[in-house]
Amino acid sequence: YIDAETMHLHHDKHHQAYVNNANAALEKHPEIGEDLEALLADVESIPADIRQALINNGGGHLNHALFWELMTPEKTAPSAELAAAIDATFGSFEEFQAAFTAAATTRFGSGWAWLVVNKEGKLEVTSTANQDTPISEGKKPILGL
């Protein structure tokens, strides 16, 4: 359970600040475009003077956008395809939950726990610090907390 005050803070304050700051950085270099996923997949292509701002704020925007997209008041189960992939990778849904919980609870300071598809096309549980996104590591996030 996450209380309304925490949700308001993250949605209306934190997430909005990430969007505003990412947009301000992008305005300095209109030639690079506005596709944050593409830019963060190749951070070295981002001009040095805005690179860290986009890593922090672009990552914060993408991370929170996925979080909001996945949130629902109803309890949901993974699709049959995802459930089979979880079982094949982790042994069971319960083992996946244990790995995901460990990634979330052992992250020192702020950050995210992720279920991602890695470069080899396999599921992986990982963790990133602060607002770093697994996209910068060539991974596709499918669940984030």
UniProtKB/Swiss-Prot annotation:
Record region (Disordered): 126-145
Result for mutant: A17T: In strain: CIP 103216
Cofactor note: Binds 1 Mn(2+) or Fe(3+) ion per subunit.
Keyword DNA repair attributed: no
A GO term from the CC aspect: cytoplasm
Residues the record lists as binding Mn(2+): H10, H64
EC number: 1.15.1.1
Binding site for Fe(3+): H10, H64
Taxonomic superkingdom: Bacteria
One MF annotation (Gene Ontology) recorded for this entry: metal ion binding
First-tier enzyme category under EC: oxidoreductase
Cofactors, names only: Mn(2+); Fe(3+)
Alphabetical list of Pfam families matching this protein: Sod_Fe_C, Sod_Fe_N
InterPro entries linked: Mn/Fe_SOD, Mn/Fe_SOD_C, Mn/Fe_SOD_N, Mn/Fe_SOD_N_sf, SOD_C_sf
Keywords tagged on the record: Iron, Manganese, Metal-binding, Oxidoreductase
Metal-binding keyword on record: yes
Membership in a protein family: Belongs to the iron/manganese superoxide dismutase family.
Biological role: Destroys superoxide anion radicals which are normally produced within the cells and which are toxic to biological systems. Catalyzes the dismutation of superoxide anion radicals into O2 and H2O2 by successive reduction and oxidation of the transition metal ion at the active site.
Name of this protein: Superoxide dismutase [Mn/Fe]
Organism expressing this protein natively: Streptococcus oralis
